[in-house]
Amino acid sequence: MFYPFIRKALFQLDPERAHEFTFRQLHRISGTPLIGLLRQSVPSKPVSCMGLSFKNPLGLAAGLDKDGECIDALGAMGFGSIEVGTVTPRPQPGNEKPRLFRIVEAEGLINRMGFNNLGVDNLVENVKKSHFGGILGINIGKNKDTPVEQGKDDYLMCMDKVYSYAGYIAVNISSPNTPGLRTLQYGEALDDLLAAIKTKQAELQQKHARYVPVAVKIAPDLSHEELVQIADSLVRHQIDGVIATNTTLDRSLVNGLNHCAQSGGLSGRPLQLKSTEIIRQLSAELQGRLPIIGVGGIDSVIAAREKMQAGASLVQIYSGFIFKGPGLVKEIVNHI
């Protein structure tokens, strides 16, 4: 109800400053009775996916709470799952500012954040303090200064540290803002990474006597042939799920709008159709052999339903949450 007024004030600020201000307030009320102000009552709509029981099909996508600072505050809003990160082995500042831009007319965002985060050890400490009752996903990536050829070592190091605390682990190989990262989506590089991840997963399962599923997050900027190859690799390596999709480099729907020429990944409404089409193609290729988590431009009940009709078992929001506020969570969970 009040979000349009809050949004109006926040949108007067630079996008990253607005984000930092909001997170400071959320962090401040976490663990206090004031968290009740954020609590939304949503119906239970259980979904079984990747061997896990989600209390409802709506999740928060990675990138909003990179360091796991506000898990409980965000959880109070009714999400069935929250994906924190992307986190890297070592802290890194990310790219130079400004690096986040609103395309207000299109309800889109362009970001070139560059995996800015305080490192995996810091994230684990924050996760330990949280009390979220839903499924917590931890999204992992590689440090910018780690050569792509050695990138798998970063993923394995993160897996080692987050395994005990994650409901599932998301492997981010599709951000456009870390040089060379998307090359890990193809051919031998992908097979090599997935084989190493499955070996590490088996080793950690034995060590912790608990199986934590692994999902791979892919880009929307893939040809049909590339998508077929990726689907084949995911099935062959028995990956537990696929998150489709990350942000796009395509600007065709925002041409001529303010900030459209900024480099980085575009998310929000302009990504909606593109990501849904990837999900549709992926679903046709996978034939139910592994589940799809649909993300990209979901800003309404209809957009969420479209993702699920295209083949997604679960859906996630991020940009729509920025533009529509917490009410979107309740609306989607109530009607999906």
Swiss-Prot record:
Binding-site positions, FMN: A62, G63, L64, D65, K66, T86, N139, N172, K217, T245, G268, G297, Y318, S319
Molecular function terms from GO: dihydroorotate dehydrogenase (quinone) activity
Cofactor(s) in the UniProt record: FMN
Pathway membership, UniProt: Pyrimidine metabolism; UMP biosynthesis via de novo pathway; orotate from (S)-dihydroorotate (quinone route): step 1/1
Cellular component terms (Gene Ontology): cytoplasm; plasma membrane
Recorded superkingdom: Bacteria
Catalytic residues (UniProt): S175
Membrane topology: Peripheral membrane protein
Catalytic activity, as annotated: (S)-dihydroorotate + a quinone = orotate + a quinol
Manner of cofactor binding, per the entry note: Binds 1 FMN per subunit.
GO BP term, pick one: 'de novo' UMP biosynthetic process
Gene3D superfamilies (alphabetical): Aldolase class I
EC numbers on record: 1.3.5.2
Family matches, as InterPro entries: Aldolase_TIM (IPR013785), DHO_dehydrogenase (IPR050074), Dihydroorotate_DH_1_2 (IPR012135), Dihydroorotate_DH_2 (IPR005719), Dihydroorotate_DH_cat (IPR005720), Dihydroorotate_DH_CS (IPR001295)
Subcellular localization, as worded in the UniProt entry: Cell membrane
Sequence positions that bind substrate: K66, N111, R112, M113, G114, F115, N172, N177, N246, T247
UniProt keyword terms in alphabetical order: Cell membrane, Flavoprotein, FMN, Membrane, Oxidoreductase, Pyrimidine biosynthesis
Family designation: Belongs to the dihydroorotate dehydrogenase family. Type 2 subfamily.
Primary role: Catalyzes the conversion of dihydroorotate to orotate with quinone as electron acceptor.
Subunit structure, as described in the record: Monomer.
PANTHER family: DIHYDROOROTATE DEHYDROGENASE (QUINONE), MITOCHONDRIAL, DIHYDROOROTATE DEHYDROGENASE (QUINONE), MITOCHONDRIAL-RELATED
Protein name in the entry: Dihydroorotate dehydrogenase (quinone)
Lineage of source species: Bacteria, Pseudomonadati, Pseudomonadota, Gammaproteobacteria, Enterobacterales
Gene name for this UniProt entry: pyrD
